[in-house]
């Protein structure tokens, strides 16, 4: 169990650092819009689906704490999503905030579905 906590911690550190890098880059591309958070949530959901399918079909469940809980848990974030939404809302950008919520939820669910579908096809 001690090793599992270390796997989650290491994966979380790597995932969080990657998210930070994406947010810096995205902030330069689209100042004022939380493209970084949107991007990591969609990419992370796609990766979650793909890796969940891979680990389930290839017997790699021992990697789940590092990859899924740690790396992808650190990489994606819905707490930042909620804060970004409220920031847009409080700036009076109500339509943008609502579009961001709808786009984030729909695209993230679509990405998980795509990841699971592709992953099951590739790794079954």
Swiss-Prot record:
Keywords: Cell inner membrane, Cell membrane, Ion channel, Ion transport, Membrane, Metal-binding, Sodium, Transmembrane, Transmembrane helix, Transport
Main location (coarse class): membrane
Xref: Pfam families: CRCB
Notes on how activity is controlled: Na(+) is not transported, but it plays an essential structural role and its presence is essential for fluoride channel function.
Membrane topology designation: Multi-pass membrane protein
Membrane-spanning segments: 5-25, 35-55, 63-83, 98-118
Signal peptide: none
Catalytic reaction(s) noted: fluoride(in) = fluoride(out)
Coiled coil feature spans: none
Annotated compartments: Cell inner membrane
Molecular function in Gene Ontology: fluoride channel activity; metal ion binding
GO cellular component, one term: plasma membrane
Single Gene Ontology BP annotation: cellular detoxification of fluoride
Entry similarity comment: Belongs to the fluoride channel Fluc/FEX (TC 1.A.43) family.
Protein name: Fluoride-specific ion channel FluC
Organism: Paracoccus denitrificans (strain Pd 1222)
Lineage: Bacteria, Pseudomonadati, Pseudomonadota, Alphaproteobacteria, Rhodobacterales
Gene field: fluC
